[in-house]
Amino acid sequence: MPITRRSVLGLLAAAGSGLLAKSSPALAAQSAQLPPETPAEYQHPAGSEIPPGPFKGTRESLKQYEVPEWFRDAKFGMWAHWGPQSAIEDGDWYARNMYIQGSDQYNYHIQKYGPQSKFGYKDTIPAWKAQDFDPAALIKLYKAAGAKYFMSMAVHHDNFDLWNSRYQRWNAYNMGPHKDIVLAWRDAVRAVDLPFGVSEHLWITYKWFSVSHGSDATGPYAGIPYDGADPANQGLYVASDQIWKDDLDWTENGIPTWWRQHWFERIKDLVDHAQPDFLYSDGQLPFEYYGYNLVAHLYNVSAARHGGKTQAVYFSKRFQDGDSGICVNDHERSIIDTISPRPWQTDTCIGQWHYKLGQKYKTPKEVIDMLADIVPRNGNLMLNVPLPASGHPDPEELAIVAAITEWTQANGEAIFATRPWKIAAEGPPAIANVAEANAGFNESKRRALTAEDIRFTTKGSTLYALVMGWPKYKFTIKSLAQNTALRVGKIQNVELVANNRKLQFEQTTEGLTIYIPNEAPSKYGNTFRITGAI
C-alpha cells in the first residue's frame, strides 16, 4: 500500500509522548518537540541572515507576535492546491507514489507512459498547460462564496516552484504553463482587496522525493534506476543520500544542513517576491533557527508594509508553535472539540488535494457543517477546490461553490467577524468516541449535523444560534434557559438571519423555545439572531 500524507501524519500524531503536544487543549502535535531555546550551533546559522526589523530569529522575539484582527474576522478562506502534479489528474502525491512499485499511481504511470527510468515525473510537467487559467474570474467566484482570504500553493513536495524563482530553475515561469502562477493569483486577489498567502511544502522534499532515486525490486525493470538517479536531474529530484520509502517520517531527522539552508533561501525568496500576507508550512515550523529567521522575516516584511505593525500570519502544524504565541496553529482535515483561546485554522479539501478524475467530493452540507462547527471554536476554515490541469473547476466543483455561496450570502452575518460565546455547541457529540474528538484527521469520523446540533457565535451584544437542520414548528435551545450557570440574560428578540423575519419565542427555566415557519429559508442550516442573551 502506498504511503500517503494522511498515514504519515496520522502515525506521527499517535507516536507517543515524545512527539505529542502536552500544553495544547486542541489536537496532539504532529511532529517533534521544539528544539532548545538557544543551542549555540543554531544561534546564527550561516546564510540565514535577515534584514533588521521588529522581530529577530528567536522564539523569544517571535513571542511578541499578535494575531491580526483581519484573520480573526475572516473565518473562511480558499486555497488553490494546484501545480504540475495536477497535470496527470490522478490525485495527490503522484510525484512520489509513481516511484513506489505496486502503488496505484505507479501502475497508472507505467501503463500510460512506460517505465519510470525512461519517462519520469519531469516528463509530465509539459502536460501542465493551465490553458483555461483565469485567476481574476476564480477569485471573483471565491469572494462571492464568502472567502475572506486566499492562498496559492507556491511549492509542493515535488520541488517545483510556482513563481519565477531565483534558486530553482524548475519553475512554472520557465516551463509548464510558462507563467508566474503565484503572482498571477496575488494580483487577482489584491485587486479585490483580500489578503493573499502562499503555502510551502518544501522542507520535507529531501526525504519525500528520495524514492525517485530507486528502482523496481521485481519484474522486467528490476534494478534499472529511475530517472531521479540521473545526476543531470538532481535539480528537480534532489541529491538525497538515502531513500525513504516505507519509512518516511515527518521529522527533520536525516535532513542535512545544506538542504536546510537551501530551504531558507528558497522560501525567503518567495516572501520577498510575493510579499504575502500569510505563509503556510506543511508540517512544523522547520529547521530550528533557519525557520525562526524565516518567520521573523515574514513578519518584518509585513510590518514594513503596514506602518511598523505586522499583519502577517504564519501557520504551523506543530501545535507548540502556535500555543507558544509565535504563530497560528493549523489542523489538517481536523476540528478541535473545545473553544481555543487562540485563533486557529482547519485546512481541508472537497476531494483529494490534487485533482483526480472521478473523485468523490464533499457535499455542500459537509462543507457548511464544518464551517459552522469550526467558527464557534475560534477557528477559521481554509478550503481547497482542486483545479484540473486546465485551471478551470469542473461542473460539480462549480455547483458546490455555488451552494456555499448561497448559504454564506444568507447566513454569513453569523459567521464573519464573529467571536465565540461561552460555549461552542449544544447537542450530541459530533464524534461518539471521545478519544477521537481531538485526534488528527478526524473530519471523516464526524457525523453529519442535524436539527439537534446548535452552534453559537457572537458579535457585540448579539448572540447567533446556528441550527444545522430544520425542526418541525418549534425547537428549544436548552443552553438559553433562565437561571443557569451560563447566566443568560432575558431574551428580547429572535429573528431569522436569512430574511430578518421576527419569530415568536418563549424563555423558561427549560430553555429558549423558538416557533418557526414550515419552510426553511436556507437548505443546509439556518441562523437565528438573538438579542438580550448577552
Residue ranges and their predicted role:
Residues 1-3:
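Secretory targeting signals
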Residues 7-29:
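N-terminal export signals
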Residues 10, 31-534:
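Mature catalytic domains of secreted/periplasmic carbohydrate-active enzymes
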